[in-house]
Amino acid sequence: CARSPLSDNQFREQLFARLPPGTKGLEKWPDFAASLHYQPVTYDRQSFLKLAAYLGELDHAQGTGGNRIFDLAVPPGLYPVIAELLGESGLSRETGLAEGWARIIVEKPFGRDLPTAIALNAVLHEHFREEQIFRIDHYLAKETVQNTLIFRFANSIFEPLWNRHHIEYVGIIAAEELGLGSRAGYYEDAGVLRDMFQNHLMQLLTLTAMEGPARFDADAVRAEKVKVLRCVRPLARDEVARWTLRGQYRSYRDEPGVDRGSQTATFGAVTWHVDNWR
């Protein structure tokens, strides 16, 4: 669903038009497309009640049991608005309008700073149980990142050496060749620190420095990541200039939509000290 006033067929035609040339299995498209539906919504309670009713009709017709995943591919400022509307319309299952499960997916940026992140968390918990909430970092889906834990803890060669006695320092580099493109509005507000450091690179830091989890499940891995973050030495205000660096690529201010006097950082470097035995 989205705000554009499309019919099911128009939505399906748009998706079909985006299939790359040479896509295999196109003979199965009609059957697959019959399961694709579109519902126009605006950000108000009446619209979400209509969405709930429409999903109920689809559940009855297709026997889906009310199982739903709400992936909020919207501007971050709308996360709390949509979470409240999902709860008020019964789609979060808090009101028991359906028997199946519900999940809500939100991706970074999760708030602009600590107060807004806490406020967003409070809104989500008002309408969803913690087990229903998925805070996604798409960087973790990269194959190299997913292989990090296996590379470390299933490898009898490297794990015994993965400590301060054998490694002087670890450098984590996320280099991109692409410029700003069409992201000026977002990037001018976020900058490289919010865009990369407090999410993607922090995840890589914890995966690199964490201890082996008791079990390879979400709760156990998360617990070990949190232990790493608690061991990161905080930077005092007078240490920031010593341990951090900010920069901006030369043509950034020439990009469409960027202020000619912009001070937004497109490059950043931080030295962290992890104060644990490893």
Predicted regions and their residues:
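Secretory/organelle targeting and membrane-embedding segments
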Residues: 1-106, 110-278
